[in-house]
Amino acid sequence: MNDRADALLSNFSDRVAARHEGETEYLQAVTEIARDVLTIEKANSAYTKARILERLTEADRIISFSVIWEDDAGQVQINRGWRVQHSNLLGPYKGGLRWVRDLSPSVLKFLAFEQAFKNALTGMPLGAAKGGADFDPSGRSDAEIRRFATAFMTQLAAHIGPDTDVPAGDIGVGSQEIGVMARVWMQHARRWGGVLTGKPVALGGSAMRAEATGYGLLYFTAAMLDAEGETLKGKRIALSGRGNVSRFAARKAIEQGACVVTMSGRKGTWHAPDGFSPQALDWLVAAEGDSAYSPPKALELTFEEGTRPWGVPCDIALPCATQNEIGLEDAKTLADAGCRYLAEGANMPVTQDAIAHLARAGVLQAPGKAANAGGVAVSGLEMQQNAGFSRWSAAQVDGCLREIMCTIHDRLTSERRSCCTQTGAVDYRRAANVAAYRRLAEAMIAAG
């Protein structure tokens, strides 16, 4: 950045930080966007006059509520719930619900802000929101989770609707919980409606929802490689996590002829030197408890306790586990081991210093707001199916998903002129921020 850009960023960051003191995750996300788009805003008099980016940093509203429910022992439990309705410039508020013990409004604000840019990139009529509760479903019985879900939706129901705010699942909230909450909303509203996405198919959910983020990640990665004259075939992929995103990304990678060499969990890494076979992947997905740490020898898979998935030589890194999982040392390891591409399956999984090091090393990096947009894309397709009282086949949904992810890639490459690396390749991180910002800015100007 030049001195003028540095000054713009410093002044802007100071103003935002004064209003959001101590909200580390949120300020990190805002700073990343601001670094890329402030000079564009200042070069456009209409954008400058409307103070587009500063307005985009403020959520429309934050809804806070208590969730009172009873556990199996008959004891009253009290949790807190939130819904950050960030922006409905482009369509109904849209974003997931997560139930995590230490959830905070700061994390939800960061996720909702990121969601606004991710949803804008899809080209679909989707606003942005995020919500959840400081509830940990692990160790809770099915009955307790149902009672909590019922109490949570009873409080949230008045604030959402098919044309207002359409939540989805996220960490701790799967299709079963979405199904319970959808039914509670219908009873509250006294009508049927596609008010939540990620529903069980029997309740109006879409085919391919579970696969969407992982498959979409591979479709975007394949488009990146194609732009460089390469394919996935034979590429070594280091993957983190073993949840839905990871397992379906691994499945699609194997299907495309790539060699998935790692997956990971809290205690360490599963390493397949010659690549996961479909059988090894199925075994790992199904394995429960401590049995997962002792793979059968026939699978040619080992578990390495206390290790991270980034120490294995690879061509492509796909971080799919959690925020800030790749730090500077991990980035150095990846670059030194020959990694040339990175695409984010998780939200903000790479720290700023790691991003900078990978960029200096010439690693092409696709941010989560573009690369993991498959989940929200299929959520949007579920909304279309619900609104039209129709149901699409898995093949139809998959075809639409592939098209959306390739269109997102094309949208980013169209920003090449102002968003390129020193070698002339597309700077995907900056291009994603710029392309999404332009769509949101034009909508804000049009709205007056």
Label every PLM stretch briefly:
Residues 65-130, 134:
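Phosphate-interaction motifs
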Residues 3, 7, 24-28, 32, ...:
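Conserved active-site and cofactor/substrate-binding residues in soluble primary-metabolism enzymes
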Residues 100, 119-233:
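Glycine/serine-rich phosphate-binding loop and adjoining beta1-alpha1 elements at the start
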Residues 46-75:
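Structured beta-strand/loop patches that form or line metal/cofactor-binding pockets in enzymes
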Residues 268-365, 370:
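Rossmann-like adenosine-cofactor binding region
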Residues 197, 204-313:
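Glycine-rich phosphate/diphosphate-binding loop of Rossmann-like nucleotide-binding domains
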Residues 2-29, 224, 335-448:
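Adenosine-phosphate binding glycine-rich loop
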